[in-house]
């Protein structure tokens, strides 16, 4: 199962490489939609079926509407593809080359170190499990851990959304 999650994570990174080197808004929306679907597949593969389904319904349902309106407003008669510009095509290939190099490095090295952020009392994160039946589901434990130990992350995410509202207002103010 972890090989499937690994392949999905490679597809996740490749979809965001395609998004970052987008030549036309249609392809950027396509990259984000594919990345959202693959990300939900990763969450489902790691045991969070409820969370993966909710993210799939909310994120992709809402974002498809937004992308539908934005591509209708910014549509072009002949949209520029990834291969029509040398700079965009080379940026796409450089991103794919870096991804392949990281995969080869992980396969050859065999281990990847994790960054420790110094959290104490990590035993609270352990899901209580028995023989084939868990007492607490992983996705619920992850949500409660986010609000318990990751309160700084929730505050940072809220502040980022608040600032992004003002950025969008400032960009669209003159129109």
Curated annotation (Swiss-Prot):
Topology within the bilayer: Multi-pass membrane protein
Catalytic activity: a ubiquinone + NADH + 5 H(+)(in) = a ubiquinol + NAD(+) + 4 H(+)(out)
Transmembrane segments: 1-21, 26-46, 47-67, 87-107, 152-172
Keywords: Electron transport, Membrane, Mitochondrion, NAD, Respiratory chain, Translocase, Transmembrane, Transmembrane helix, Transport, Ubiquinone
Molecular-function GO terms, alphabetical: NADH dehydrogenase (ubiquinone) activity
Enzyme class, broadest EC rank: translocase
Family: Belongs to the complex I subunit 6 family.
Function: Core subunit of the mitochondrial membrane respiratory chain NADH dehydrogenase (Complex I) that is believed to belong to the minimal assembly required for catalysis. Complex I functions in the transfer of electrons from NADH to the respiratory chain. The immediate electron acceptor for the enzyme is believed to be ubiquinone.
Name of protein: NADH-ubiquinone oxidoreductase chain 6
């Amino acid at each position: 199962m972890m090989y499937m999650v690994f392949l999905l994570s490679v597809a996740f990174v490749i979809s965001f490489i395609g998004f970052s080197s987008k030549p036309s808004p249609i392809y950027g929306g396509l990259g984000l939609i594919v990345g959202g679907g693959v990300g939900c597949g990763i969450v489902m593969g790691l045991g969070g079926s409820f969370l993966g389904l909710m993210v799939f319904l909310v994120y992709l349902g809402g974002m498809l509407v937004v992308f539908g309106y934005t591509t209708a407003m910014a549509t072009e008669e002949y949209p520029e593809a990834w291969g029509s510009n040398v700079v965009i095509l080379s940026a796409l290939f450089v991103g794919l080359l870096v991804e392949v190099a990281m995969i080869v490095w992980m396969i050859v090295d065999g281990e990847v170190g994790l960054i420790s952020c110094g959290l104490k009392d990590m035993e609270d994160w352990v899901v209580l499990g028995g023989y084939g039946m868990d007492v607490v589901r992983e996705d619920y434990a992850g949500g409660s851990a986010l609000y318990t130990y990751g309160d700084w992350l929730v505050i940072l995410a809220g502040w980022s959304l608040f600032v992004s509202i003002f950025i969008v207002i400032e960009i669209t103010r003159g129109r």
